[in-house]
């Protein structure tokens, strides 16, 4: 990388041949590592954004113009080398106002590329112009940050990128397997309970009484029903053994024909 932040064509060819891009003996890629391409013509702003990204454990490549960014991505000519298909860039963060090529023009170039159109692009600007923000978002920008960029902004971008990297590297492929394993662990459903109409005879209620004898009249019912004496046996013995009878008792026992 040049001192001004650019990547020369010679340096890019060395990275391709030695192992920086598409090398044979390159280090294994960490799934949690996020590679960010930072583009800004201001040296101070470029240093600030690079430090913020490194604080959040991001791998940073910083360049000073949109043309340098296209060179690094292999989009500076119509025939891009096949080696750049292996280039891993998870995020591109670029300034809006730059000489030669603005951040909006760089955004359009990236979205027109078949290799990097899915890479999220974040635009930075020190001017809060709504028309500029809307135009970048409509073109496909992931976010629009106002300078000076804060550490909270970078952490928010970092958290979203980490989730996307993990999801694209395994979670989507594991979803069908997990669902099948859950279904296989469940017991088979029991057959539905059916009641056959022939299993038991239908319940019928007879309207005829079980007793075939004719109904009794009220007089017969009264005469045939046993009368319970309200006087106990002991009281009866006392009454019969008494030599004197009360007038009420004698009056009841006296026959009306004898009077």
From Swiss-Prot:
Q: How does it assemble?
A: Interacts with the phytochrome B photoreceptor. Binds to AHP1. Interacts with DEGP9.
Against InterPro entries, the record matches this protein to:
ARR-like (IPR045279), CheY-like_superfamily (IPR011006), Sig_transdc_resp-reg_receiver (IPR001789)
Instruction: List the Gene3D superfamilies hit by this protein, alphabetically.
Output: 3.40.50.2300
Species: Arabidopsis thaliana
Low complexity: bias regions? 195-220
Q: Which gene encodes it?
A: ARR4
State the UniProt keywords alphabetically.
Answer: Cytokinin signaling pathway, Nucleus, Phosphoprotein, Transcription, Transcription regulation, Two-component regulatory system
The name of this protein is Two-component response regulator ARR4
In its record, the post-translational modification comment is: Two-component system major event consists of a His-to-Asp phosphorelay between a sensor histidine kinase (HK) and a response regulator (RR). In plants, the His-to-Asp phosphorelay involves an additional intermediate named Histidine-containing phosphotransfer protein (HPt). This multistep phosphorelay consists of a His-Asp-His-Asp sequential transfer of a phosphate group between first a His and an Asp of the HK protein, followed by the transfer to a conserved His of the HPt protein and finally the transfer to an Asp in the receiver domain of the RR protein.
What is the phylogenetic placement of the source species in the record?
Answer: Eukaryota, Viridiplantae, Streptophyta, Embryophyta, Tracheophyta
